[in-house]
Amino acid sequence: MASLIGGSAIQHLAQDIDTNKINHKAKANGPNLAPKSRALDMVSKLEPSRGPVHEHWWDLTSPQLASMLEEAGYPVGRQLEILLFYNHTIPEADSSRNWQSLLPVTVVPLEYSWKWDTACESPEVRLTIEAFGDLSGTRADPLNQAAAIELLHRTKGVLPDLNQTWINHFCSTLFDEDKDKYMEEAQSGTGMRLQSTMLVAFEFGRTSTSTKTYLTPRRLGQQGFARLPEYMPAIQALGPSRALDTLMDFLHTSPEGVELTPFGLSFDNVEPTSSRLKFYFASPNTSYNSLREVLTLGCRISKANFNIEEKIRTIHSLAKALMVAPDNLPDDEHISARAQPQSLSSASDPVTSDIVKERTSLLAGYQYYFDIAPGADLPDIRFYAPIRKELINDRGVAAAVTDWMKAQGRGKFCDNYVRMLEGMAGERGLSKCHGLHSFIGCLIRRDGELDVTSYLLPG
């Protein structure tokens, strides 16, 4: 990233900001009323707008990203690098067309994530973009993949380790070649409507940036999400995977496993031997017993160095707080879902209404991913608790997460997190916001520590 304006230039800018050589004046930032970060102020002065769409993205989202980086404790020089990188990767094509977005947003198709600190690591900020181009939704690119691939091509100059081997593999094996037929299907009403099938994520480490690709398979004639057998030839072509074999055994033999529905894949854009391969599933169930069965793969996973049952109990306590369930909920009882009021959904929008219908089964229960990359004996498993915004506002979500983090002895960045959210909420205030949070994810690491991530939508 330093090559955009030169590494030494970034170092000098960071030193100037840190020593207040630059006369900085805080300004209001549109919907985000928090003062501009010093790094954002400098990047905004250095980088001109590249058109109205770019300006819209930058004005809305750059203050939010800058606040996340600042509150997460990134060094100023790294904040500058990331904001410059983001400025140069913002889509320049209009995404406001009549289009089914993969992301549950109406402002810009983007999702942030805040990976919480651990005993050895500070928080990490990430974002996922649904890119659009002039050809998105046309016969040339009916499933909106070209814009995401072009975005990765543009970043390859500053991310030299970027590798698209698995993108090429999965695009050739999970989709049909005849683009005209996708258009004909959608126009005739015999198939699903056109929608994006690819997202790009950027993970901003303390010293480097990495990328990840999300794919949702789409075959001609497909109705709803692709079924498990449609994934298998593409995954198995990558080579033997004991983790995959274990997962398949669980999916076919466990009462909980047979109820899991696949809905996508993601992988790191690196050499395949170093990449994760995450297989995403949705469950209609939300009981403790269900959670335990999945996170242990039906007792196939056990840990000698820590009490896994205790870890799952701790995760379930967070899920109950987020989903507004009683503390004394019996282990075999599910957290009941309630219909979402129209005032908190987009049911009046016919495009978004279709999306809401398709996602109903996903949002009703828990979600999981299983890392099945070749090489591991057992998959790492991440659990996602959906935020039911009809039951809890974002201040309530923030309180649930931060209280839980403090109870785990991990409260160092809790005040920073709330300040960041308050900036995203702006004048409305967190108590009147429903929907900044989309999910909270938890993974039990191999050392027993809980890896926790908040997923956030633009305010």
From Swiss-Prot:
Q: Which reaction does it catalyse?
A: quinolinone B + dimethylallyl diphosphate = peniprequinolone + diphosphate
- Can you name one GO molecular function term for this protein? prenyltransferase activity
Please give the pathway this protein is involved in. Answer: Secondary metabolite biosynthesis; Alkaloid biosynthesis; Mycotoxin biosynthesis
* Positions that bind substrate: R126, R276, K278, Y280, Y384
> In terms of domain of life, where is this protein from?
Eukaryota
Instruction: Give the GO biological process terms.
Output: alkaloid metabolic process
Binding, L-tryptophan? V107, V108, E111
Q: InterPro entries from the xrefs?
A: Aro_prenylTrfase, Aro_prenylTrfase_DMATS, DMATS-type_fun
- The enzyme's first-digit EC class, named in words, is transferase
Write down the Pfam families for this protein, in alphabetical order. Trp_DMAT
The record's keywords, sorted A to Z, are: Transferase
For this protein, the record's CDD domains field holds: PT-DMATS_CymD (cd13929)
Q: What EC number(s) are associated with this protein in UniProt?
A: 2.5.1.-
Q: Which family does it belong to?
A: Belongs to the tryptophan dimethylallyltransferase family.
User: What's this protein's function?
Assistant: Prenyltransferase; part of the gene cluster that mediates the biosynthesis of penigequinolones, potent insecticidal alkaloids that contain a highly modified 10-carbon prenyl group. The first stage is catalyzed by the nonribosomal peptide synthetase penN that condenses anthranilic acid and O-methyl-L-tyrosine to produce 4'-methoxycyclopeptin. 4'-methoxycyclopeptin is then converted to 4'-methoxydehydrocyclopeptin by the ketoglutarate-dependent dioxygenase penM through dehydrogenation to form a double bond between C-alpha and C-beta of the O-methyltyrosine side chain.
- PANTHER family in the cross-refs: INDOLE PRENYLTRANSFERASE TDIB-RELATED, PRENYLTRANSFERASE ASQH1-RELATED
Q: NCBIfam families from the xrefs? A: arom_pren_DMATS (TIGR03429)
Name of the featured protein? Prenyltransferase penI
Gene transcribed to yield this protein: penI
